[in-house]
């Protein structure tokens, strides 16, 4: 019999990709469906739907500026969401819970790169998103300790930065690469030759598409993968290098310039992907340059976004 899957965060960009591969799953589409900060409502909803597997995507997210200005809100709201989802799964005996974390859970200093899954609580996270990171760390600890005590099949996946065709553009919630692509499309539409981005451009980041990450989630379901792991590609590029890809795709019509203003965030946070490769031996990432071009074309064709 096919497992019944419940997905939190059904309006997220990742969920929009996931719906293409898991159309029959139950998606919680924001607070209109369920307020995950309310435990009694969460428990009642989960009890009524009675899923076999919960994919926990929901979280309060934002960019560096928003995280720096509101660390308490990011910690408190996400702590409520995560513990309520976890508690409901535990109380109802739901067999599988897969939670989505972020590489921001890893220490900012005194760590070897690429960073492995056993380094989550070995130092303080990057201060620019401390509140969000700490809430995700607690979720990882809950998962590990639950499995240790109950021999459970709960796990978490730690993806690198994601990008894709996000629809409406929100500068306060968008990662660098989607912002770069969106602004490049606007510059092309306006006939501008130079695009200015904040920061030094020297920091290193890994980016993969929402679609690719959705595919690995489905792969884990289909192959009953219950271990926790990092999800990341082999490359780790500077933001300047991502800018060069844009310049190449646009045949030099766009020149990307970094103005040196604003916080860069942590210099690097590339994740070790050896465990992922052992677990998902047949999985292949989409080509980065082609994926960036697809997103750029999307924004050019939808210039009202």
Give residue spans per PLM region.
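Adenosine-cofactor binding site in Rossmann-like domains, unifying the SAM/SAH pocket
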Residues: 23-44
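SDR active-site strand-loop-helix element
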Residues: 8, 29, 54-60, 97-103, ...
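C-terminal substrate-binding subdomain of Rossmann-fold SDR/epimerase-dehydratase oxidoreductases
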Residues: 12-13, 19-21, 186-305
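NAD(P)-dependent short-chain dehydrogenase/reductase
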Residues: 109-113, 117-118, 144-221, 245-247
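Canonical Rossmann dinucleotide-binding motif of NAD(H)/NADP(H)-dependent dehydrogenases/reductases
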Residues: 2-24
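Conserved Rossmann-fold NAD(P)-dependent oxidoreductase catalytic core, especially the SDR/UDP-sugar
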Residues: 83-129
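Active-site helix of classical SDR
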Residues: 131, 135
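NAD(P)H-binding glycine-rich loop region in Rossmannoid oxidoreductase-like domains
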Residues: 40-79, 91
């Amino acid at each position: 019999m096919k497992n019944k899957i419940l997905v939190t965060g059904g309006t997220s960009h990742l969920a929009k990709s996931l719906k293409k591969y898991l159309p029959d799953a139950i998606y919680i589409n924001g607070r209109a469906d369920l307020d995950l900060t309310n435990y009694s409502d969460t428990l009642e909803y989960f009890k009524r739907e009675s899923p076999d597997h919960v994919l926990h995507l929901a979280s309060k997210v934002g960019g560096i500026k928003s995280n720096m200005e509101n660390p308490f809100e990011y910690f408190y709201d996400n702590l409520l969401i995560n513990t309520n989802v976890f508690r409901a799964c535990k109380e109802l005996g739901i067999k599988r819970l897969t939670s989505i974390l972020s590489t921001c859970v890893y220490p900012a200093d005194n760590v070897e790169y690429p960073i492995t899954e056993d380094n989550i609580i070995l130092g303080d996270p990057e201060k620019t998103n401390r509140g969000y990171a700490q809430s995700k760390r607690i979720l990882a600890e809950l998962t590990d300790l639950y499995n240790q005590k109950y021999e459970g099949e709960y796990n978490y996946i730690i993806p690198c930065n994601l990008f894709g065709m996000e629809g409406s553009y929100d500068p306060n919630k968008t990662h660098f690469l989607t912002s770069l692509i969106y602004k490049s499309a606007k510059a092309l539409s306006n006939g501008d030759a130079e695009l200015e981005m904040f920061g030094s451009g020297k920091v290193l980041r890994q980016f993969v598409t929402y679609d690719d990450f959705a595919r690995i989630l489905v792969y884990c379901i289909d192959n009953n993968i219950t271990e926790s792991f990092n999800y990341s590609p082999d490359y780790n590029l500077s933001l300047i290098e991502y800018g060069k890809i844009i310049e190449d795709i646009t045949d030099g019509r766009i020149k990307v310039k970094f103005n040196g203003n604003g916080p860069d965030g942590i210099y690097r946070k590339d994740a070790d992907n050896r465990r992922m490769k052992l677990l998902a031996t047949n999985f292949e990432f989409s080509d980065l340059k082609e994926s960036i071009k697809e997103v750029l074309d999307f924004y050019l064709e939808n210039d009202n976004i």
